[in-house]
């Protein structure tokens, strides 16, 4: 299977590549639109700011490439957030706009520290193939200060002061707010499920 990990310059690419390798799959780290378009599965990991990620995607001519995709793509953490229409980060950033009418906001909770860092539960519907063989008691590893509120594309939610989207899907575009590659067996199972969709 051809698996591409998008190199936005704003992510730890090694950890996701190692996690995929442990599942028995090879992947390629690339920012070449022609390779991305030919890949069967695509990962868009992201760490840092929406502004930096969008600048890199523009610079590498990947915005239109991403919008053309019909094969499954998984945005991880910031990768999911930039699928929204707009981020209030960095005084406002227009993002890719896959999840229409969805906006990324600062996680506002008066008595909890930011970033939201550590292990937390996700509340999901077992029937979705992304959650196959994942127990509802499992926890996943989060590191973020911005969220996408609950919306029509939300597949799973998490509470940290407020409830927010921790897994989203629109057609072939999937997103997770947590880091499956750092989430132990449950994260590995979710990656496996995505690769088998």
Curated annotation (Swiss-Prot):
EC number of the protein: 4.3.2.10, 3.5.1.2
Cellular location(s): Cytoplasm
Superkingdom of the source species: Bacteria
Positions of disulphide bridges: none
Annotated GO biological process: L-histidine biosynthetic process
Organism (species): Buchnera aphidicola subsp. Schizaphis graminum (strain Sg)
Residue ranges occupied by any Glutamine amidotransferase type-1 domain in the UniProt entry: 2-197
One term of GO molecular function: lyase activity
Record-linked HAMAP family: HisH
Residues of the active site: 77, 179, 181
Assembly notes: Heterodimer of HisH and HisF.
UniProt keyword Hydrolase, yes or no: yes
Listed name of the protein: Imidazole glycerol phosphate synthase subunit HisH
Keywords, ordered alphabetically: Amino-acid biosynthesis, Cytoplasm, Glutamine amidotransferase, Histidine biosynthesis, Hydrolase, Lyase
Pfam family, any one: GATase
Pathway note: Amino-acid biosynthesis; L-histidine biosynthesis; L-histidine from 5-phospho-alpha-D-ribose 1-diphosphate: step 5/9
Function: IGPS catalyzes the conversion of PRFAR and glutamine to IGP, AICAR and glutamate. The HisH subunit catalyzes the hydrolysis of glutamine to glutamate and ammonia as part of the synthesis of IGP and AICAR. The resulting ammonia molecule is channeled to the active site of HisF.
GO annotations of cellular component type: cytoplasm
């Amino acid at each position: 299977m051809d698996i591409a990990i998008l190199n936005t310059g704003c992510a730890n690419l090694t950890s996701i590549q190692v996690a995929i390798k442990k599942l028995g799959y090879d992947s390629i780290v690339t920012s070449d639109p022609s390779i991305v378009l030919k890949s069967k599965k695509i990962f868009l990991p992201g760490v840092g700011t929406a502004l930096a990620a969008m600048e890199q995607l523009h610079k590498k001519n990947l915005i239109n490439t991403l919008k053309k995709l019909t094969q499954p793509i998984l945005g991880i953490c910031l990768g999911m957030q930039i699928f929204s229409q707009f981020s209030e980060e960095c005084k406002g950033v227009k993002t890719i706009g896959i999840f229409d009418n969805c906006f990324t906001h600062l996680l506002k909770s008066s008595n909890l520290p930011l970033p939201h860092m550590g292990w937390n539960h996700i509340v999901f519907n077992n029937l979705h193939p992304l959650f196959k063989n994942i127990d509802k008691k499992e926890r996943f590893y989060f590191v973020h200060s911005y969220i996408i509120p609950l919306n029509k594309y939300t597949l799973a939610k998490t509470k940290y002061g407020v409830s927010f989207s921790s897994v989203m899907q629109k057609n072939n575009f999937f997103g997770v707010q947590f880091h499956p590659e750092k989430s132990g067996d449950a994260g590995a199972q979710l990656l496996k499920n995505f690769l088998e969709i």
